[in-house]
Amino acid sequence: MIDRKLLLQDFDKVALSLKKRNNAMGDELERLREVITRYKKQLIELEGLQAFQNKVSKEFGIKMAQKVDTSDLKKELENNKIKLNELSKSASELEQQIDLKLSIIPNLVDEKTPLGANEEYNMEIKKILTPRVFTFKPKEHFELAQQNGWIDFESGVKLAKSRFSVIRGFGAKIYRALIYLMLDFNEKNGFEIIYTPALVNEKMLFGTGQLPKFKEDVFKIENENLYLIPTAEVTLTNLYNDTIISVENLPIKMTAHTPCFRSEAGSAGKDTRGMIRQHQFDKVELVAITHPKESDVMQECMLESASEILKALELPHRFVQLCSGDLGFSASNTIDIEVWLPGQNCYREISSVSNARDFQARRAKIRFKENQKNQLAHTLNGSSLAVGRTMVALMENHQQADGSIHIPKALEKYL
């Protein structure tokens, strides 16, 4: 959540950030401006009424001590108190309206984030590893998966519905090996391995920004205040919900392997075949909580940690700086890692590493104490990596002419 003080004192800065995101909020933003104007006016009136109440109360006390008639002053105090209570209630209601709007306003766009309306304006930063030149036409992963008996898409549909899969046989061993490899690399880079619940309450999803704006994107448990997690970012970040951390304990670096669940609302017709876009998928996540001065360096650290895994698996990839119009709700700055998929002849996202600055920390009340003063921490999150998409990339990049899959040396010890 952005700072309410900023919204009240520099509304135009917030409006400009929304414009950069290609998200002007239209009439809603103007209505918010009107509410803020009324709220500020009422605060000034409240100050005046309170000052008057204090002044008359003092006079009332003096006259009472002097045993002088105070009936007029008493009436003034009573009338003023009624006005105070009414205005205080009205201001409180306006404050609630502002806070509700605040909860659906996305993070401020970082100065380093380039301007752009959509993903077409994203900027490639660098490429790592050169894509292999095939002497045959490479197949897509769903063909290879079925040929090798690694993934059973039909059974996924039978057990649930479309966008679910069953991984079995040697494919399941590869899948498990990828998870172990990812966790080992992340731990080597200083991230504590944590296993968390796959269900969270509404407060936790508010803390990381999924609620209230993106309610349709998450699965809710019927008759319970519980939701299936869309990412371990939710659980790892909220381990420190409403917590004050000693500055000596920063940064906090965490990694978790979890199943993730997403409704994929608005994705109809996209990636309908294979494992690219699923309702349930596994992901190894990185989350860091840092001092504000250290979050930029941490973002680079997290990117390199994810890139190390792809290099070990001999998978060509690139870093892409997202433009302002392609940023996620809670992100101030995001760099994607895209992996090369020869079957599709393009790069596809396999990790997004985002710096949320103090946006999530303000929502979740994640603070640190330095010099006897509580301050908001910075939070970062990123995949390291999406397991299914890594398996997709492995199949497509390491396929042989006969459809078999070469297994990278880095995975051998896990098989």
Give the positions of each predicted feature:
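N-terminal alpha-helical targeting/anchoring segments
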Residues: M1-R132, W150, E154
